[in-house]
UniProtKB/Swiss-Prot annotation:
Propeptide residues, chain positions: 51-74, 98-116
Biased composition (Basic and acidic residues): 31-42
Lipid-linked residues (O-hexanoyl serine): S26
Name this polypeptide is given: Appetite-regulating hormone
Organism: Capra hircus
Signal sequence interval, chain numbering: 1-23
Chief site of localization: secreted
Listed InterPro entries: Motilin_assoc, Motilin_ghrelin, Preproghrelin
Subcellular location: Secreted
Processing after translation: O-octanoylated by GOAT/MBOAT4. O-octanoylation is essential for ghrelin activity. Amidation of Leu-97 is essential for obestatin activity.
Length: 116
């Protein structure tokens, strides 16, 4: 019968050999893919500037006074853009926002005419 020292050594070497064999497994193997799969993070439904957090939150139930006259602008370019402003905000930022939109739409119109 082999000595206990020899049996322990063989057992240790076989365990190390198994770890080495598992470490060298292909990244494409199904077992490795199962181990590496993680649940993707889902982004929140709405993105809000930090200064406006809670002002227009539908969960709160009540909005700031003066929010009855809201301005909402949505348009589709290569991507969707939506902007929602309260009455006070539209008075404060409306002119700048209008100029910004006009510049964007004017550049797009010029590119369309140049392509034709």
């Amino acid at each position: 019968m082999p000595a206990p020292r020899t049996i322990c050594s063989l057992l240790l070497l076989s365990m190390l050999w198994m770890d080495l064999a598992m470490a060298g497994s292909s990244f494409l193997s199904p077992e490795h893919q199962k181990l590496q799969r993680k649940e993707p993070k889902k982004p929140s439904g709405r993105l809000k500037p930090r200064a406006l957090e809670g002002q227009f939150d539908p969960d709160v139930g009540s909005q700031e006074e003066g929010a009855e006259d809201e301005l909402e602008i949505r348009f589709n370019a290569p991507f969707n853009i939506g902007i929602k402003l309260s009455g006070a905000q539209s008075l404060q930022h409306g002119q700048t926002l209008g100029k910004f939109l006009q510049d964007i739409l004017w550049e797009e119109a010029e590119e369309t005419l140049a392509d034709e």
